[in-house]
């Protein structure tokens, strides 16, 4: 099997969560040139390792690590080894993160700031992977999807949000 035949990409928007996009991908040769996202990107590496430049650092996310980028922050990405990497990503509209901040603080239209690009938090990584898998199989009713996503994001913001800034 060639390296490229090992690559696979599934990108979708859950029909009941229009402010969320999901990616489940395996890459071997793929590399991403410097770019940014308008919203938050939050994910977990399942296999291999992802290396990326972010906020002036060269970071590596291994299985069990959470990788993330905040809106507007330029980054790149590539395999950290010959076997590539497999990961699950949430791409979140800012309104989704603003809701999580509101649930915690009562403050509207504020986004959390998280400086780290890689978090070594096994419990959070497992929670991200589990919800992502559930959304992929579409096994949860709408209210449960919304509730679990909000719960995950409020936990994330409560643990790692360093400060909140006006949009």
Question: What positions do the PLM features span?
Answer:
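N-terminal regulatory/effector-sensing and dimerization cores
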Residues: 3-110, 137-138
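Proteins with a high burden of low-complexity, intrinsically disordered sequence enriched in S/T/G/P/A and R
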Residues: 56, 92, 157, 166-167
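Amphipathic alpha-helical segments enriched in hydrophobic/aromatic residues interleaved with Lys/Arg
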Residues: 105-166
